[in-house]
């Protein structure tokens, strides 16, 4: 885990996805190319970088099955944060994204 760019990256999922009980201590905490993620009981000490994926339609499924319900773009922004602690990163000025929930300001 030495010299990694970010703590976590999620790519092209329509959810649900759960990230719980983590310590995200890198200046570049979370890169999100997805939607439908719940972040619960985490310490988040870096920047959050959100992306829309509007050039790649991907399948999504009916609940509780692997049957494909259709295809859609990832418009992002549909994430939930519950009981997290946010701190200002030490450094990370070269990291993309915003501090805490500032990344969601445009949604």
Residue ranges and their predicted role:
Residues 1-107:
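Glycine- and acidic/polar-rich repeat regions and solenoidal domains
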């Amino acid at each position: 885990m030495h010299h990694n760019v970010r703590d976590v990256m999620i790519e092209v999922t329509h959810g649900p996805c759960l990230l719980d009980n983590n310590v995200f201590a890198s200046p570049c905490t979370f890169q999100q190319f997805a939607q439908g993620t719940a972040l619960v009981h985490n310490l988040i000490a870096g920047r959050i970088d959100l992306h829309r994926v509007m050039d790649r339609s991907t399948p999504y499924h009916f609940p509780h099955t692997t049957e494909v319900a259709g295809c859609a773009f990832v418009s992002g922004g549909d994430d939930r944060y519950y009981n997290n602690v946010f701190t200002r990163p030490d450094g990370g000025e070269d990291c993309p994204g915003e501090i805490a929930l500032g990344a969601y300001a445009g949604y």
